[in-house]
């Protein structure tokens, strides 16, 4: 341990706060919080740890800490620091999925919709539905039962839904506000948990229709009841109070945490969410960080109640989220928490087995690759590849593999700026120069190994820039392909010597994955640029189309093919004035032009 670390550890306060662990480049690699900073921070440098924590501790050369006045303040500060620094050892929930809602529009003739976009309009929203299929099945049932209009625009004549009895045809008939209100109220009652009452009313109407010998009507009502039963069978009641609540459980094993969330809506367990991640804190602290990020994401709506295990500070959760948080001691809620805990434990055991098997393979491949090349274990590998077609739209791509796995947030794309024509060597020089000049300037992590997709010329060009211009001495290897453009072997050293790997070895498979991934990333980027240039060149001669409108059209349609199939109205919808839309349409439909 560094001497200055011992000195800082000796004067840590016994107060709550946050700590920031830093590596040799001064980059924040982990942010944590603690009720007692002195105890928590010292624990990293004493006692035994699992492999993942050992890796973290091995990179720590300095730390900072911030004292807070309370545990709540520490939790809030921790989440803000994680967002600011994005440390590589912290969990950073980036769940961008949005859940569907059922919406009753506020139009004069209202409609029933499925939407993932909740707006501050006068519409009524019901949800969210973590299970999208459940939302669609419920809407389908309501469409059959309640005849609100279905068409987005009013047609000139009645549609099929009218003939099926699922629409009152406001397009050709007068449907009063009172009629719509009656239907909307019934839908609201159903969605608010009143399906039993609705079912009972339908059953009464079915018997009345049968007694009046209205057998067709009775059959329709019977079918509606059957649809209700089918939907509700999938959403069996587990709580009688109809309160919306999220029930949390968790398990910890071998430095990993699994959190299970049960979504209970209107008394029914409708879906669950499973998250698994490495943990470097005490389990309770890790759980609090997770739950803070879970609801900070807009796709997770806070229910009326949050139920947490007994080991968690429910008062802190309640104050932070401003939602009722409970720790049940008995009853159905406690049973649900225990069920969530049990599921978390089982999921962790199953997943951990797969992770262990996968990590053993990938880490061993990385270690063996280092041995074969005569270098330190290349935990971080960065690979480069160029792509162009006869010199047009030349691009390059860089990917990163960390611990033998793709680290996609580290990928970078480059448009070649200084090279004219198809010159692969100069393109490689430019990209390596740009990448590592920026890495030095911004203090970005440097790789343990650089792989250049190419032969001796590519390797020489990249090495010259790295060593003679930037003064960096990072192991660099060329990835040579065979005549079928498949991975053959590596070359390394000065002069470059071939390193032959066993074709059935894990390290060879790792190189294949690196080659395939960097090639895929580069060629995809090139095709995107090439497609854009084709569209833009096709639009160059159209009067009234400048760069701004080209970008609008490209963003809206995505391809020249879709533009050629579009109508004048669709060009207007894309933001073009009517006269410009007509000009574009005429130009693109002229066979002599394209």
From Swiss-Prot:
<dbReference type="Pfam" id="PF01541">
    <property type="entry name" value="GIY-YIG"/>
</dbReference>
<keyword id="KW-0227">DNA damage</keyword>
<dbReference type="GO" id="GO:0009380">
    <property type="term" value="C:excinuclease repair complex"/>
</dbReference>
<keyword id="KW-0267">Excision nuclease</keyword>
<dbReference type="GO" id="GO:0005737">
    <property type="term" value="C:cytoplasm"/>
</dbReference>
<dbReference type="InterPro" id="IPR010994">
    <property type="entry name" value="RuvA_2-like"/>
</dbReference>
<comment type="function">
    <text>The UvrABC repair system catalyzes the recognition and processing of DNA lesions. UvrC both incises the 5' and 3' sides of the lesion. The N-terminal half is responsible for the 3' incision and the C-terminal half is responsible for the 5' incision.</text>
</comment>
<dbReference type="InterPro" id="IPR036876">
    <property type="entry name" value="UVR_dom_sf"/>
</dbReference>
<keyword id="KW-0742">SOS response</keyword>
<dbReference type="GO" id="GO:0006289">
    <property type="term" value="P:nucleotide-excision repair"/>
</dbReference>
<dbReference type="InterPro" id="IPR038476">
    <property type="entry name" value="UvrC_RNase_H_dom_sf"/>
</dbReference>
<protein>
    <recommendedName>
        <fullName>UvrABC system protein C</fullName>
    </recommendedName>
</protein>
<feature type="domain" description="UVR">
    <location>
        <begin position="196"/>
        <end position="231"/>
    </location>
</feature>
<dbReference type="InterPro" id="IPR047296">
    <property type="entry name" value="GIY-YIG_UvrC_Cho"/>
</dbReference>
<dbReference type="InterPro" id="IPR004791">
    <property type="entry name" value="UvrC"/>
</dbReference>
<dbReference type="Pfam" id="PF08459">
    <property type="entry name" value="UvrC_RNaseH_dom"/>
</dbReference>
<dbReference type="InterPro" id="IPR000305">
    <property type="entry name" value="GIY-YIG_endonuc"/>
</dbReference>
<dbReference type="Pfam" id="PF02151">
    <property type="entry name" value="UVR"/>
</dbReference>
<dbReference type="Pfam" id="PF22920">
    <property type="entry name" value="UvrC_RNaseH"/>
</dbReference>
<keyword id="KW-0963">Cytoplasm</keyword>
<feature type="domain" description="GIY-YIG">
    <location>
        <begin position="14"/>
        <end position="91"/>
    </location>
</feature>
<dbReference type="InterPro" id="IPR050066">
    <property type="entry name" value="UvrABC_protein_C"/>
</dbReference>
<comment type="similarity">
    <text>Belongs to the UvrC family.</text>
</comment>
<dbReference type="InterPro" id="IPR001162">
    <property type="entry name" value="UvrC_RNase_H_dom"/>
</dbReference>
<dbReference type="GO" id="GO:0009381">
    <property type="term" value="F:excinuclease ABC activity"/>
</dbReference>
<keyword id="KW-0228">DNA excision</keyword>
<dbReference type="InterPro" id="IPR035901">
    <property type="entry name" value="GIY-YIG_endonuc_sf"/>
</dbReference>
<dbReference type="InterPro" id="IPR001943">
    <property type="entry name" value="UVR_dom"/>
</dbReference>
<comment type="subunit">
    <text>Interacts with UvrB in an incision complex.</text>
</comment>
<dbReference type="GO" id="GO:0009432">
    <property type="term" value="P:SOS response"/>
</dbReference>
<keyword id="KW-0234">DNA repair</keyword>
<dbReference type="GO" id="GO:0003677">
    <property type="term" value="F:DNA binding"/>
</dbReference>
């Amino acid at each position: 341990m560094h001497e200055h670390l011992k000195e800082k550890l000796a004067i840590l306060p016994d107060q709550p706060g946050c700590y920031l662990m830093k590596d040799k480049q001064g980059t924040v690699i982990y942010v944590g919080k603690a009720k007692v900073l002195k105890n928590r921070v010292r624990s990293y440098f004493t006692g035994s740890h699992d492999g993942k924590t050992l890796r973290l501790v091995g990179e720590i050369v300095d730390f900072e800490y911030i004292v807070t006045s309370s545990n709540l303040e520490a939790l809030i500060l921790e989440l803000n620091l994680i967002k600011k620094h994005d440390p590589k050892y912290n969990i950073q929930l980036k769940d961008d999925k949005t859940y569907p809602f059922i919406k009753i529009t506020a139009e004069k003739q209202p409609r029933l919709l499925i939407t993932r976009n909740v707006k501050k309009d006068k519409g009524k929203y019901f949800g969210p539905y973590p299970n999208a299929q459940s939302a669609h099945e419920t809407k389908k049932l309501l469409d059959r039962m309640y005849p609100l209009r279905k068409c987005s625009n009013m047609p000139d004549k009645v549609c099929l839904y009218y003939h099926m009895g699922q629409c009152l045809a406001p397009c050709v008939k007068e449907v009063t506000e009172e009629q719509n209100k009656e239907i909307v109220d019934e839908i609201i009652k159903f969605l608010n948990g009143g399906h039993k009452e609705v079912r009972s009313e339908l059953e009464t109407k079915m018997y009345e229709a049968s007694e009046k010998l209205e057998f067709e009507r009775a059959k329709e009502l019977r079918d509606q009841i059957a649809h209700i039963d089918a939907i509700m069978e999938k959403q069996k009641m587990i709580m009688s109070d109809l309160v919306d609540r999220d029930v949390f459980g968790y398990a910890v094993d071998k430095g990993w945490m699994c959190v299970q969330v049960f979504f209970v809506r209107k008394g029914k367990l409708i879906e669950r969410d499973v998250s698994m991640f490495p943990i470097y804190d005490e389990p309770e602290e890790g759980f609090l960080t997770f739950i803070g990020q879970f609801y900070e994401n807009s796709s997770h709506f806070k229910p009326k109640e949050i139920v947490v295990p007994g080991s968690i500070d429910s008062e802190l959760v309640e104050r932070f989220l401003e939602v009722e948080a409970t720790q049940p001691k008995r009853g159905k809620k406690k049973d649900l928490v225990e069920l969530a805990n049990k599921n978390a434990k089982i999921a962790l055991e199953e997943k951990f087995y797969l992770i262990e098997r996968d990590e053993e393979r990938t880490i061993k491949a990385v270690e063996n690759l280092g041995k074969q090349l005569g270098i330190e274990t290349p935990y971080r590998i960065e690979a480069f590849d160029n792509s162009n077609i006869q010199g047009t739209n030349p691009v390059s791509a860089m990917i990163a593999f960390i611990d033998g796995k793709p680290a996609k947030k580290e990928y970078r794309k480059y448009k070649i700026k200084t090279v004219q024509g198809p010159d692969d060597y100069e393109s490689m020089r430019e990209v390596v120069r740009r990448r590592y000049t920026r890495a030095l300037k911004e203090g970005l992590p440097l790789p343990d190994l650089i792989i250049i997709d190419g032969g001796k010329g590519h390797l020489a060009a990249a090495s010259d820039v790295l060593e003679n211009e930037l003064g960096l001495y990072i192991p660099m290897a060329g990835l040579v392909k065979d005549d079928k453009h498949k991975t053959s072997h590596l070359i390394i050293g000065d002069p470059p010597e071939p390193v032959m790997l066993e074709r059935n070895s894990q390290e060879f498979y790792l190189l294949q994955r690196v080659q395939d991934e960097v090639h895929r990333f580069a060629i995809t980027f090139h095709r995107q640029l090439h497609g854009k240039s084709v569209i833009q060149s096709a639009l160059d001669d159209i009067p009234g189309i400048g760069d701004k409108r080209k970008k609008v059209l490209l963003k809206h349609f995505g391809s020249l093919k879709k533009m050629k199939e579009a109508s004048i109205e669709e060009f207007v919808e894309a933001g073009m004035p009517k006269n410009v839309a007509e000009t574009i349409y005429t130009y693109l439909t002229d066979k002599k032009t394209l």
